[in-house]
Design a protein with these regions (language model features):
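Bacterial Sec-dependent N-terminal signal peptides
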Residues: 1-24, 523
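C-terminal outer-membrane/trafficking sorting elements
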Residues: 20, 465-473, 477-553
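Primarily auto-inhibitory N-terminal propeptides
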Residues: 20-85, 103-129
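Subtilisin-like serine protease catalytic core
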Residues: 23, 40, 158, 168-211, ...
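Autoinhibitory propeptides
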Residues: 74-162, 168-171, 349
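C-terminal subdomain of the subtilisin-like protease fold in secreted/lumenal serine endopeptidases
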Residues: 159, 280-286, 419-471, 475
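Substrate-binding/access-modulating region of protease and related hydrolase catalytic domains
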Residues: 171, 237-240, 253-350, 360, ...
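Extracellular S/T/G-rich loop segment that most often corresponds to the catalytic His/Ser-adjacent loop
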Residues: 186, 346-419, 423
Length: 553
């Protein structure tokens, strides 16, 4: 009997070797794209790129390249039996990331099309998915019937960082990121699907989708909160409480970072996210992430690696720029540490790396410094990164610091500027911002070319503002809307506001004095009126009357 049990145990071991084999996640690089057998061809890009991605290439004269082709399905199918899980694929790097048992490594290496295998990280552990209950929705309905609001009040907590860059002047000219797509690569977006600051972009379908490249999970809303905070600086919209830098842009929320560990695999997660962003037709990548050292010290980068051509993530960031996207990356928060220098991918060429200043425009002590190892100016630009107010996961607003939070200030406003100048390439847009930064004539290693002036970059002059037309937003509206009043000479008399329905019935009649009108009027009087089209008549002086339609949903 004992002999039979021993035989059974030996058979069990022989047939279940993989159960006891140690598994890890590896990078598997291929030698080529197998173009003879690959069903994807460059002459048929609709099979692997979105229409918007193809349009971007055509608009800026960017040719399709071998790096645009997906991996060879034949190669993947050949090695798939030896993989526990396939995590990500990279057409740019011609590689994939997979969890593999140690006993399968030699079998994978034996394939002639396998160029290299490289350890990246331990296997994925069970993710922590602790959802926060009891989200408190902030009530913003207690508004006066019609009141005047200055810019500083309208923007709420974000007036200071936005006005420092004159971003509010872009917004006044109706450039708020409309028709621009921003991909946010981050560690998670907890409660973005619930928080009131994102209600505006949710109800207007401005969240195009989500992906998790870090753990292959279908949800990004129950993980880390860092991306939530970053996104709020661009997409937040609660008038008089919190207005972000690009509230009309559309967003992809892409999780590439695992908050509890740091391995080189996260750079490859980022690469997969950037490739997805490209294929989906993204205009701007916001990356408030950076890498220097890892939990496995053999994977650590050195300052010599900060040349834009060595680390995987920096090579991918340059590749993303070559596809026509504007990549905006945080410089890093190690300016007061031994490392001191920028982190990857901030060292990449052709992208914008962003440092931090305090509310007075002075260098923030923690902001990572340049130059790159090969002597290029880094960071290129700077924005406020001290005392930034961001959305917390419990619907409160908290104050925080870091280049993670100066970066979306630049990304969002860059989307607004690109909206105004769609004919510019990403490189031309970058150069336009650099030329209009306050240290352009004398860049340094702390702030690079300095703080960009988006009004000047947008060719907005004071005399233009004085001639600007009345602007009504949001239009369509649901409960309330705002009227931007141009700075024309109104004299000493009152400003008259009248609103009519399509039957010609006057449903609102208000007047304001020049001293109280300011730049913006908030109207809440139509909250109880039926949906439909209304006519606004605004008389600024006897010679200046504007009529405009507005739609209530």
């Amino acid at each position: 009997m004992k002999k039979n049990l021993w035989i059974l145990f030996v058979i069990f071991l022989a047939t279940n070797t993989s159960t006891f084999a140690q598994s890890s996640r590896f990078l598997i690089e291929f030698t080529d794209k197998d173009t003879i057998n690959n069903p994807f061809i460059l002459s048929d890009p609709e099979e692997f790129l979105s229409e918007r991605a193809i349009d971007r290439r055509e608009r800026y004269g960017i040719p399709l390249e071998i790096s645009d082709l997906p991996l060879s399905p034949r190669y993947i199918d050949s090695i798939k039996p030896y993989l526990n899980t396939l995590q990500n694929k990279s057409k740019w790097m011609n590689s994939l990331v997979a969890e593999v048992d140690s006993v399968s490594l030699d079998s994978i290496r034996s394939f002639s099309f396998v160029k290299n295998l490289k350890f990246l990280a331990p296997p994925i552990s069970a993710p922590s998915k602790k959802d926060l209950s009891g989200i408190q929705v902030q009530d913003t309905s207690e508004l006066k019937e019609a009141t005047t609001v200055s810019d500083s009040i309208y923007y709420g907590y974000l007036w200071e960082p936005i006005s420092m860059l004159n971003g509010h002047l872009l917004h006044k000219h109706s450039h708020r990121g409309d028709n621009m797509v921003i991909a946010v690569l981050d560690a998670g977006f907890r409660n973005v699907d619930k928080l009131p600051v994102f209600q505006y972009i949710r109800q207007n379908n401005q969240i195009l989708g989500t992906r998790d490249f870090a753990e292959n999970d279908s949800q990004v809303y129950d993980t880390h909160s860092h991306g939530t905070m970053v996104l709020s600086l661009m997409a937040g919209y609660i008038p008089e409480v919190y207005i972000g830098t690009a509230p009309e842009a559309e967003y992809w929320l892409l999780r590439t970072e695992v908050g509890g560990s740091e391995y080189l695999i996260e750079e490859y997660n980022w690469i997969a996210g950037a490739e997805f962003a490209d294929s989906a037709g993204t205009d701007i990548i916001n990356s408030s992430l950076g890498y220097t050292t890892f939990d496995d010290s053999t994977q650590n980068h050195t300052f010599q690696d900060m040349n834009g051509e060595t680390t995987p993530i920096s090579k991918a960031a340059s590749m993303a720029a070559s596809k026509g996207m504007l990549v905006v990356s945080s410089a890093g928060n190690q300016g007061n540490e031994i490392w001191q220098y920028i982190s990857a991918p901030a060292d990449a060429d052709s992208i914008i790396s962003v440092g931090s200043v305090d509310p007075n425009g002075k260098y923030a002590f923690f902001s990572s410094t340049g130059p790159t190892y090969d002597g290029r100016i880094k960071p290129e630009l700077a924005a406020q990164g001290i005392s930034n107010v961001v959305q917390n996961v419990d619907s409160s607003f908290i104050m925080t610091h870091g280049t993670s939070f100066s970066t979306p200030i630049v990304s969002g406003l860059a989307a607004c500027l690109w909206q105004k100048f769609p004919e510019l390439s990403n490189i031309e847009l970058k150069e336009k911002l650099i030329r209009n930064a306050n240290q352009y004539a004398s860049p340094d290693s702390l702030l690079g070319y300095g703080i960009p002036n988006f009004a000047r970059a947008g060719d907005i002059r004071i005399e233009d503002l004085n001639k600007s037309s009345v602007e009504i937003f949001p239009n369509p509206f649901k409960n309330h809307f705002y009227i931007n009043i141009p700075d024309v000479n109104t004299g000493e008399g009152p400003i008259y506001l009248e609103i009519y329905d399509l039957m010609g019935r006057k449903i609102l009649n208000r007047q304001f004095t020049k001293t109280t009108a300011g730049n913006r009027i908030r109207i809440n009087a139509l909250s109880d009126t039926p949906t439909g089209i209304y006519l606004i008549k605004l008389s600024l002086n006897p010679d200046y009357t504007i009529k405009q339609k507005i739609v209530k949903h």
